[in-house]
């Protein structure tokens, strides 16, 4: 890994991309501490200190990197955009006319435009809900509520689009996937606080945390990270033979089907899809008994929350993977290029690929589900602090590891395009061996 960091600072273009990415993420972190106009930060700090670790606000705060508890301009993060993307993709998958539209370049631009329109709707809805939540906090507002609600909705909606613009700038001028890195940075900043809370709890006799359990759980943490890396790279290879033109010889190739083709997207989608209704319900918790009951049932790291998270992760794993890898499209492309799968008839190819993908995705989704229940087990069996259990959970671990690997692979690809792959191949050999 020394060679990797050496390349980041010795290759001029790569150094520029790396520093630009850090600069954008730094601005995001600074913005996470800028409160919405009309909010009293002192009243907020006093209120959130009195909240339980299991409160819904701590859950929101975890994925926003502390922006939610500060009621900052970035308190919604990019959640509204991801929610809108999920809805649009479900519609595209359900309606053939939209699917056909997406195939053309003009149609893709229309779909992106619809996604941004829906992002505005989602941001306004979440902004309104968080405004109601702010009203329920004693002394939080230092301006009239009717003025605050307008300012808050406008501010957080603008903040979401600023973050989307940041993500696009990272995609164009930086390193890695911009949106994923923004989520990644929000989780990573909580890592230091989580470790500090763990050591503080170990020193507190009332917490009754056994140091042996700490070593055991941290060992499991390292093991899970290694398994996630393995799962990220694991793939099923299907042999394909292509006939050469004007000859009887064939060329052998293979079709790689990853254990989890959609990467961290199912985890991000599941987290956001849970967060959106909870955020809206939290705004009405002060006036609605039903909202309070639903929020108590879906308490973070509770049984029903964990169960819903597992179901959503499995569902999105299948849904998004089938969008990325359509057995029908793949089989048609193989036939058009004169390819065959040994032992499989041409008209049976689609069914064969579909069955292989279903079995592969089943294994991948079960793996993700097992990791999804880790926070529940760590919190309820070992009684670890909430932040620590969240860091060890599916959402945080998979996002951190997945985004880090994606960024490394993008750096490797960039170096290869610049003719520097021989100098740096040893740095990335570990990725190829996994």
Locations of regions flagged by a protein language model:
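N-terminal cationic and glycine-rich segments that engage phosphates or anionic surfaces
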Residues: 1-434
């Amino acid at each position: 890994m020394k060679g990797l960091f050496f390349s980041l600072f010795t290759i001029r273009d790569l150094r520029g991309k790396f520093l630009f990415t850090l600069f954008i993420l730094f601005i995001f972190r600074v913005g996470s501490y800028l409160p919405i106009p009309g909010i009293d930060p002192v009243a907020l700090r006093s209120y959130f200190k009195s909240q339980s670790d299991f409160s819904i606000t701590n859950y929101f705060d975890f994925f926003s990197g502390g922006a939610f508890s500060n009621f900052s301009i970035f308190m919604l993060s990019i959640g509204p955009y991801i929610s809108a993307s999920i809805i649009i993709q479900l519609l595209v998958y359900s309606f053939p006319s939209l699917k056909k539209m997406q195939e053309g370049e003009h149609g893709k631009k229309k779909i992106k435009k619809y996604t941004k329109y829906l992002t505005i709707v989602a941001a306004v809805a979440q902004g309104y809900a968080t405004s109601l939540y702010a009203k329920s906090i004693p002394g939080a507002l230092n301006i009239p509520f009717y003025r605050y609600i307008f300012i808050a909705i406008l501010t957080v909606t603008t903040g979401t689009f600023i973050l989307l613009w940041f993500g696009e700038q990272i995609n164009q001028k930086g390193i890695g996937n911009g949106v994923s890195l923004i989520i990644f940075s929000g989780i990573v900043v909580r890592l230091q606080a989580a470790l500090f809370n763990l050591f503080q709890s170990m020193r507190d006799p009332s917490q009754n945390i056994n140091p042996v359990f700490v070593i055991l759980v941290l060992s499991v943490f390292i093991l899970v990270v290694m398994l996630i890396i393995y799962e990220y790279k694991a793939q099923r290879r299907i042999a394909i033979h292509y006939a050469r033109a004007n000859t009887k010889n064939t060329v052998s190739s293979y079709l790689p089907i990853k254990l989890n083709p959609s990467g961290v997207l199912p985890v991000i989608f599941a987290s956001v899809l849970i967060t959106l209704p909870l955020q809206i319900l939290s705004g009405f918790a002060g006036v609605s008994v039903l909202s309070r009951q639903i929020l108590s049932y879906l308490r973070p790291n509770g049984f029903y929350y964990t169960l819903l998270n597992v179901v959503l992760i499995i569902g999105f794993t299948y849904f998004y993977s089938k969008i990325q890898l359509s057995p029908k499209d793949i089989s048609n492309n193989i036939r058009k290029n004169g390819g065959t799968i040994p032992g499989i008839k041409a008209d049976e190819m689609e069914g064969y690929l579909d069955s292989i993908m279903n079995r592969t995705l089943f294994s991948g989704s079960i793996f993700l589900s097992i990791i999804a229940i880790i926070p529940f087990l760590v919190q309820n069996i070992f009684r670890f602090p909430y932040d620590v259990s969240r860091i060890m959970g599916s959402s945080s671990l998979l996002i951190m590891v997945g985004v880090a690997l994606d960024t490394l692979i993008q750096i490797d690809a960039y170096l290869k395009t610049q003719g520097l792959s021989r100098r740096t191949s040893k740095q990335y050999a570990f990725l190829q061996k996994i």
